[in-house]
């Protein structure tokens, strides 16, 4: 192989490495943002679940409030 060919291959590999580094950083930032979004959505879901429980009490009575079945 000629010296010029090796230099071209090395330059190509360096460009690919730089591109991959940039891509990894971009993907890492995106994953971090999505993790924050998921946490926010999870917190909102918990809050909505609590609000729903507070405004619509269950129609199911607790066991001690239930009358025993007729066969007892």
Swiss-Prot record:
Gene3D superfamilies: 1.20.5.300. Residues 53-72 are annotated as: Disordered. Pfam families: SlyX. It comes from the Bacteria. Belongs to the SlyX family. HAMAP family: SlyX. This is Protein SlyX homolog. It comes from Marinobacter nauticus (strain ATCC 700491 / DSM 11845 / VT8). The gene is slyX.
């Amino acid at each position: 192989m000629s010296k010029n060919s090796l230099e071209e291959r090395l330059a190509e590999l360096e460009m690919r490495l730089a591109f991959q580094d940039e891509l990894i950083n971009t993907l890492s930032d995106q994953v971090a943002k999505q993790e924050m979004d998921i946490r926010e959505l999870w917190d909102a879901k918990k809050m909505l679940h609590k609000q729903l429980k507070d405004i619509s009490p269950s129609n199911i009575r607790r066991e001690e409030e239930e009358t025993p079945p007729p066969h007892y």
